[in-house]
Amino acid sequence: MLYRNRFLVLLALAGLLAFLSLSLQFFHLIPVSTTKNGGSSKSRKRIMPDPVTEPPTVDPVYEALLYCNIPSVAEHSMEGHAPHHYKLVSVHVFIRHGDRYPLYAIPKTKRPEIDCTLVASRKPYHPKLEAFVGHMLKGSGASFESPLGSLPLYPNHPLCEMGELTQTGVVQHLQNGQLLRDIYLRKHKLLPNNWSSDQLYLETTGKSRTLQSGLALLYGFLPEFDWKKVYFKHQPSALFCSGSCYCPLRNQYLEKEQRRQYLLRLKNSDLERTYGEMAKIVDIPTKQLRAANPIDSMLCHFCHNVSFPCSRSGCLGMEHFKVIKTHQIEDERERHEKLLYFGYSLLGAHPILNQTVNRMQRAALGWRDELFTLYSAHDVTLSPILSALGLLEARFPRFAARLVFELWQDRQKPSEHSVRILYNGADVTFHTSFCHDFHKHSPKPMCPLENLVRFVKRDMFVALDGSSTNYYDACHGEGA
């Protein structure tokens, strides 16, 4: 018996040591055997970098991995967190579409072979993927605002079409929807079980990738939803400016911002040399390569762990990718410093922020319609909103990025309402320009709705030039 007990103790110790060894290897605290070129000793054709913690300096590969937003374990999020005496009243969600096939092809190279059919046996996978496809097949008679009715409800091409949503993109938004369901429906009961169509507001641009992303999130949020209760409105503008899109001053800011981008590119000799090398490899003029926006296609290769394209003269490589990605990061940094993009953002984001504030005010008055709002959009939609809110440290919108506005009511003081702003699950409320110092001089744990209302109705115009008091005057004034 004594020997048996000793054996069991030794066996337990051996198991513990094995677990510690694997854990240390996973967190890169002890070395793993590598080949001469630094790769894993296992033979692999393609290597996907896997940083565990954020590097101390800006790393283009790490930033690119964050941008890919590859589905993995359930993420930690702060949506739905509030003191117990607060009641959730309404939620307004802005998303960027999920992972997509490139919008541009690099001339004289083979397109990346990405399958855009939805297959349960292929990674990334989601438990609701097959059910999602089955439900989409039942939606052929869905009534959406024109021209959305002519778009496919899910991606289904063996070789993706340009700009098409991939299986990764669908899974990203199924995850988003399920996360929001767990928080807002199961925990906070935002919608009743017999919810009605007027309690949802759904809007998307006319691209299949945004409609399909919206449907994937909606299915994760409301599995097996009734098609008769779902109506997507079409938004012609990526800024979601509806009837307020004409804004001359906004266009002036954009032109000057594009000029700034051009001048920064000219100053980057590393970037120009890299474009020259890449153009020589694919045997086209440098100007033609630059116009093809090669980083768009290379990001698809990178996110899907597919080798970069080659020609008879060689291959585009990771060093080329790093140089272009590093320039993108530098461009974002300078963009925030020069403030031209900030002026563009204030005017570009005002219509959609004004709509959101109006909905929140109605909900605060007790209206029970449009309790859950979803805008399925693009990076060029979310980026101006983030900038206008003063979230200068926010990363550029990744695939399937989500920006959430929550409206809360204080049960102890029912006339008082508060807002929370969350970006990819992080609470950024007290980083916004309208609430960044509120907690310094107030004991209240939440940011008052009035702060956001005042910001949208007045302070956004003050930040532009101080003389305008409404959107029309600001758009037709002088300032850029």
Curated annotation (Swiss-Prot):
Membrane association type: Single-pass type II membrane protein
Catalysed transformations (reactions): 3-O-[beta-D-GlcA-(1->3)-beta-D-Gal-(1->3)-beta-D-Gal-(1->4)-beta-D-2-O-P-Xyl]-L-seryl-[protein] + H2O = 3-O-(beta-D-GlcA-(1->3)-beta-D-Gal-(1->3)-beta-D-Gal-(1->4)-beta-D-Xyl)-L-seryl-[protein] + phosphate
Glycosylation-annotated residues: 194, 305, 354
Disulfide bonding pattern of the chain: none
Side Cytoplasmic, residues: 1-6
Cellular location(s): Golgi apparatus membrane
Presence of the UniProt keyword Iron in the record: no
Active site (catalytic residues): 97, 379
UniProt GO BP: chondroitin sulfate proteoglycan biosynthetic process; glycosaminoglycan biosynthetic process; positive regulation of heparan sulfate proteoglycan biosynthetic process
Any one Gene Ontology cellular component term annotated for this protein: Golgi apparatus
GO terms, molecular function: phosphatase activity
InterPro entries xref list: His_Pase_clade-2, His_PPase_superfam, Histidine_acid_phosphatase
EC number of this enzyme: 3.1.3.-
Transmembrane segments: 7-27
Residue ranges that the UniProt entry lists as topological domain Lumenal: 28-480
Matches recorded under Gene3D superfamilies: Phosphoglycerate mutase-like (3.40.50.1240)
Pfam families in the cross-refs: His_Phos_2
UniProt keyword terms in alphabetical order: Glycoprotein, Golgi apparatus, Hydrolase, Membrane, Signal-anchor, Transmembrane, Transmembrane helix
Subunit structure and binding partners: Interacts with B3GAT3; the interaction increases the 2-phosphoxylose phosphatase activity of PXYLP1 during completion of linkage region formation in a B3GAT3-mediated manner.
Role description: Responsible for the 2-O-dephosphorylation of xylose in the glycosaminoglycan-protein linkage region of proteoglycans thereby regulating the amount of mature glycosaminoglycan (GAG) chains. Sulfated glycosaminoglycans (GAGs), including heparan sulfate and chondroitin sulfate, are synthesized on the so-called common GAG-protein linkage region (GlcUAbeta1-3Galbeta1-3Galbeta1-4Xylbeta1-O-Ser) of core proteins, which is formed by the stepwise addition of monosaccharide residues by the respective specific glycosyltransferases.
Family: Belongs to the histidine acid phosphatase family.
Record-linked PANTHER family: 2-PHOSPHOXYLOSE PHOSPHATASE 1 (PTHR11567:SF110), ACID PHOSPHATASE-RELATED (PTHR11567)
Descriptive protein name: 2-phosphoxylose phosphatase 1
Organism: Rattus norvegicus
Gene (UniProt): Pxylp1
